Amino acid sequence: MNHFELFNLPVALDIDLASLKSNFLSLQQQYHPDKAADKDQALIKSSEINQAFKTLSQVDSRAAYLLALKKQDHHLDQSISDFEFLQSALELREQLDEATSSEHLRTLRLEVQQWIDGLVREFKIDYSEEDWAEARDTVRKLRFFQRVLNDIDKAEDQLLDDEDSFDLDDDF
């Protein structure tokens, strides 16, 4: 049984994330180790459910998993050789490093999301045409942008923490 079947979803890049979450919670309840007669087996199943959910939750890992189902997921850890992409990626990273406001981070998030949306469209075409080399390259780029999104989340959290914190020395 593949991850999509586990959550009763179509084998596709575009899935209903609300259904994924709902089915995940239902399966977690069903296979919770504290409620099972065979706790070891339930623990294994629960771990599989968690891993499948994590894989399908993000578009980059979902795309990589689709390639794995077609046995086309080899060399996904290779570096990206597209010079123009690498140049744009470096500029994005620099912008993130220099971001000092939540507004700047929001703008950056929108830009990254636009890149991701374009790459999702590319992946769908590559996948449907079975252009596996291009599909793998697109997954590498999706992974990069997913990491940037994660870093934007961290930067936003850090900004919020900085705004909420106060200097104890000022009070004494």
UniProtKB/Swiss-Prot annotation:
- For this entry, list what GO says about its biological process: [2Fe-2S] cluster assembly; protein complex oligomerization; protein folding
Domain J: start-end pairs? 2-69
In alphabetical order, the GO MF annotations are: ATPase activator activity; protein-folding chaperone binding
Q: What is a single Pfam family found in this protein's UniProt entry?
A: DnaJ
Which keywords label this protein?
Chaperone
Sorted alphabetically, which SUPFAM superfamilies does this protein's record hold? Chaperone J-domain (SSF46565), HSC20 (HSCB), C-terminal oligomerisation domain (SSF47144)
Q: Which PROSITE patterns match?
A: DNAJ_2
Write down the CDD domains for this protein, in alphabetical order. DnaJ
Top-level division of the source organism's lineage: Bacteria
Is the keyword Chaperone in the record? yes
> What InterPro entries does the annotation carry?
DnaJ_domain (IPR001623), HscB (IPR004640), HscB_C_sf (IPR036386), HscB_oligo_C (IPR009073), J_dom_sf (IPR036869)
Known partners and oligomeric status: Interacts with HscA and stimulates its ATPase activity.
Q: Which HAMAP family match?
A: HscB (MF_00682)
Family designation: Belongs to the HscB family.
| Role noted for this protein | Co-chaperone involved in the maturation of iron-sulfur cluster-containing proteins. Seems to help targeting proteins to be folded toward HscA.
- Protein name listed in UniProt: Co-chaperone protein HscB homolog
Instruction: Give the encoding gene's name.
Output: hscB
